[in-house]
Amino acid sequence: MGLTVIDYYGKQISKCGYCKGIQCSISHGMHTYQMTPHDYQDLIDRGWRRSGHYCYKQDNKMTCCPCYTIKCDALEFKLTKSHKKILKRMTRFLRDGKKERSEIGGTPTINNEGEGDEGQSGEDGARGGIGDEIHRPNIPVKNINLEAAGKANKNRQKRLTGEEKVARTLYEKSEAKSNDPAKDTDRSQNTCDGVNLPCKKAKQMRLERSLAKQAAKCVSPEAGMTKTRKCPKNPEKSLRDFIDDVTNADRHKLRLNITHVKSKQFEDTLKQSYALYEKYQTLIHNDRPNNVHDYLEFLQRSPLKHCKTEDGPSIGFGSFHQQYWLDDQLIAVAVLDILPYCVSSVYFFYDPDYSFLSLGTYSSLREIELVQQLASSVSSLRYYYMGFYIHSCPKMRYKGKLCPSYLLCPEAFTWHLLTDEIRSKLNAQKYQRFNPEVLAKDIDEFVEADINNVLLLVDQNTCITYNDYIQVSIAFFLLYILSFDMEAFSLFK
C-alpha cells in the first residue's frame, strides 16, 4: 500500500471561515506529501480533514466554532419529503426542459426545510444551506382590521350552521345511493338539492379520487355480489427508483462520469471544469480564482495514492471528480475521496444558471446513491462523510437532515446518532463530549509506545524509525559535548 509521508506544522491560528472572526480558529495542521487511503480513513475517523495536500484538525475545546465529523449511513438512508421534491423537480426538468412557476425569472426556490440553492461553503468541502439573506419582494401590505373581520366571520358561521347541517345530511344520503364511488368523488358541482356545500381543497379532492380508484380496483364480483379485498400497498420508491425515472423521450439527458484526478479523462475535460469553477467562485462566492494553478492546487492535487485491491471497488481507492453532464454541457463537479469504509465529500461546485435545480442537495443524494452502488460489491464501504458539522453555524445544520447521521465524539472517538437531545446540548454549549461513559484507558487512541515505530524521512531516499532517530540524535549530542570538552581542556592546559 505504500507509505504516508507528512510534515507536521503544529498548532495553527487563523481567521474563521464560519463566524468570520479574526485569529480565533485554532487547529492542528500538517502537509501530506503522500498518504495511503487506509491512513486517511483512520485520520478522518479522528477528526481530520484535507484541503489539497493540507490536513487539519480543529481544536474543538479552544476554537471559536467546534467542528464535529459527520457521516450518514447510506444503507439505512431515508428520503424526506424535501428530498423527493428535489428529485422530482430534476425528473420534470429532464422530461420537458421547463422550469417551475416559482423558478421563472431566475428566482431560487426555497424548499420545505428552509434550504435554497445549496452551493459549497467552507474549507471542509460541505455544501452550504440558504444564503445569508432571503430578500422578499417589496409588496405593500394592506391594513386590515382583524378584530372586525373576526366578528363578521363568527356571525356568518352562526347564520350558516343550520344550512350546513342539512347540506351534509343530504350529501351523505346521495353518497350512499351511488354505486360508482369513482364518480362520486369526481363531481364538478359542490351542490346538493339546491344547497351549497362547503368547497373542498384541490388536494383533498385529488386524495378522494385516488382512494376511490383504489377501492374500485379492489372490488371483485362473485355470485352476483361484490366482495372487497385488501389492496396491497405500493412499495415506497427508493433513491435509485427516483434517479432511474427517465425515458428515451426526455428532452434532456443527464449523465454522471467519475474520473480519477490523474487520469487522461480529467486532463481532457480540464478546460471545461476550470471554466465552471471560475464561474461558480465568481458568481457565488465573489472570489474569482487567479489562474488554473489555484484550481489544481485546491481540487485536483491529492496526497492519496490511487490503489486497487481485490476486495476494493473496481475504480479503486483515491481522489476522484464526479462530473455532471447535461447533454454535452458540464454543469456540476463533485470532488470525492473513495476510502475503505466511505465516500468522503471534499468539495462541490456547479453552474449558477442551474441553481433552480438545488444541485447542492441533489448531488448529496447522488453521492449517497454512489455509496449504495459501491457497497453492493464492497460490504465494508457503507458510509457517506460530509465533512464537518458546525452547529454554531446555521448554514451547516442542513447536513443533519440526511438521516441517519452520526457525529464523532471529539474525545472518545465514538459515533453517536444525531438526535434532538444532542442538538439541545449543542444549543446550550458549543463544545460537547458525546460519550460521557468511556474512560481514558478504554479509548482507542494513539499511545506513546507507537511513536517508536513511526518512520522519519531523513532525506529523499532514507527513512529511519523515531526510536532510531532519537538514539542517533543522542549519540551526536554526546559527541558534540565531548568534542567541546576536549577543546576546552586543551585550551586550559
Which functions belong to the PLM regions below?
Residues Y33, D45-W48:
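N-terminal accessory interaction module
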Residues Q323-Y406:
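Aromatic (often tryptophan-rich) hydrophobic motifs at membrane interfaces
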Residues G10, I22-S25, Q34-M35, G52, ...:
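Terminal, non-catalytic protein-protein interaction segments that mediate quaternary/complex assembly
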Residues S377-D442:
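Active-site/acyl-donor-binding loops of N-acyltransferases
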Residues L43, Y277, K399:
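A residue-level signal for conserved active-site and pocket-lining positions in enzyme catalytic cores
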Residues S51-C64, D73-K78, H83-F356, E448-K493:
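A conserved beta-strand-loop-helix scaffold within acyl/acetyltransferase catalytic domains
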Residues M1-Y18:
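Intrinsically disordered, low-structural-confidence terminal and linker regions
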